[in-house]
């Protein structure tokens, strides 16, 4: 379940006119803080039934976190909801272990050993070698301590190297976060997507106009999960992790073939991707056994010397999908990482992207034009984006196309002063077009950028940054 407040309100805290995740797009059908509301209602009715939270809302609020809506540090959602556990991240491994344990007769309070879960306890007697985080009482009043705590959490998001973490809530005991579950193998990914999903909304919703958000993804293929891009404003590190997990070509071809039998399918696959469309393998071989590096990103500020830059598997997959009978066109809409494309010396992918997979406009996310702001964002310098545009234009000329790159920009990110905002505005003006949208920075729980926004500190050192706003 996504954050309900995010679908109810803009970042300016104004009511949205439409909720794309509700029947007919109608606003107001779901309560704010739905995880807390629904969990407490269940607890009132089923007092002894185990309640396990899952999904991105619970995952990002699993420990003490800054809440933009109330402008303060909130408890772990586990305390406010009255639930017993959180299965954080994507959850397949942990939810199966939880179900098996409960089915065997174990009480829910005994389930302290499952990777990818968060639970509460009175003391630390059953927690092996935990990292003791600053207490909730400390982080809610001291911004530097909050930044220190978040830095520790950020460094413990890898299943191969993370340790349990304990956060004290005084007389209420401790919230314990176990290390993340191991990433799914390709076989496991295929098994997940081979399940008999109806891919339809409940019939009762159809009468109310359906769920608008479903139309956007109905004929799209999820080919991967996880992202080693490392953007500071993105919550994926906390939710899906940095290790790439992919589906096999066979799995994706089978799903695409099923799509062609849908009466509503018009021959167009809208997307083949995931968090980043063109990531199809771990960033380096080390990740498969050692996990990701601490205090070091794969692409920022420049690509790591150990980075494997290779689009050949993705190119092969797209070629196979294009050949499926009944498929007229395969588009890529979930976002191409332009610095990864620039780093690839083999330009086959870029050429075929332009020739076959762009629906007139390619959406890319440079986010800003100020290198100082881009540094705070964890994004490559503006010169890398300019280089991508040159290569993209050249590929269009080579293929006889005239397609445009539509940039997505973000305003108000921590570190962006009026000077940088004017620089971005002038750049957009000089482009000669009005962008469809500019995302105002949204302080989502559990991101580095949100920590900067709240504390004014630059991680990992937690030194106060004079030029952060």
Stretches found by the model and what they are:
Residues 415-428:
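Catalytic cores of alpha/beta
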Residues 258-406, 410-414:
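Conserved SAM/AdoMet-binding glycine-rich loop
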Residues 84, 252, 364, 438:
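Conserved, mostly hydrophobic/aromatic
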Residues 140-181, 188, 194, 201-205, ...:
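Radical SAM enzyme core and accessory elements
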Residues 4, 460-469:
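Single conserved hydrophobic/aromatic residue that forms the stacking wall/gate
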